[in-house]
């Protein structure tokens, strides 16, 4: 039984079914590997360089395309009040947030790094999932932890460089 409930949207209408399935399989594997609660939800959107550039500009003030952006729902934004969900008796599934991947950037990077587009999409999906779980790579020690875990998950799945 799948651990994650994944709401997948392909805005490009160009992604192959096997690529979508691979990314879903890797995310499900990663969720099990990382012991994420069953029924946890996330949304995954595949877009173009222009689509991700608009998001990057609007939400991160960076007017350029990037490979993956994650928006964690439990991450505190500036001026927001923290909600302690333990105070509520909720039977609703936990929603991690959104992962947005540029398929064009994934293709470019796959060529640059000399591996398949599928490997790059899997890498970006796991990278995005780790961000939703609170991992980051702004500091060298954080980067070592996050990238180490990312490699561990991808290697365990069998998607190596």
Swiss-Prot record:
A Gene Ontology cellular-component term: cytoplasm
Q: Where does Zn(2+) bind?
A: 127, 131, 137
Q: What Pfam family does this protein match (any one)? A: YbeY
Q: Which cofactor does it need?
A: Zn(2+)
List, alphabetically, the InterPro entries matched: MetalPrtase_cat_dom_sf_prd, YbeY, YbeY_CS
Outline what the protein does.
Answer: Single strand-specific metallo-endoribonuclease involved in late-stage 70S ribosome quality control and in maturation of the 3' terminus of the 16S rRNA.
**Main localization of the protein described in the UniProt heading:** cytoplasm
- How is the cofactor bound, in the record's words? Binds 1 zinc ion.
Q: Which family does it belong to?
A: Belongs to the endoribonuclease YbeY family.
What Gene Ontology molecular function terms does this protein carry?
Answer: metalloendopeptidase activity; RNA endonuclease activity; zinc ion binding
Q: Where in the cell is it found?
A: Cytoplasm
- What is the name of the gene encoding this protein? ybeY
This protein is called Endoribonuclease YbeY
Q: What is its EC number?
A: 3.1.-.-
Q: Which organism is it from?
A: Listeria welshimeri serovar 6b (strain ATCC 35897 / DSM 20650 / CCUG 15529 / CIP 8149 / NCTC 11857 / SLCC 5334 / V8)
Q: Which GO terms describe its biological process?
A: rRNA processing
Keywords from UniProt, A to Z, are: Cytoplasm, Endonuclease, Hydrolase, Metal-binding, Nuclease, Ribosome biogenesis, rRNA processing, Zinc
Alphabetized Gene3D superfamilies for the sequence:
Metalloproteases ('zincins'), catalytic domain
The protein's matches in PANTHER family, at most eight in alphabetical order, are given as: ENDORIBONUCLEASE YBEY, CHLOROPLASTIC
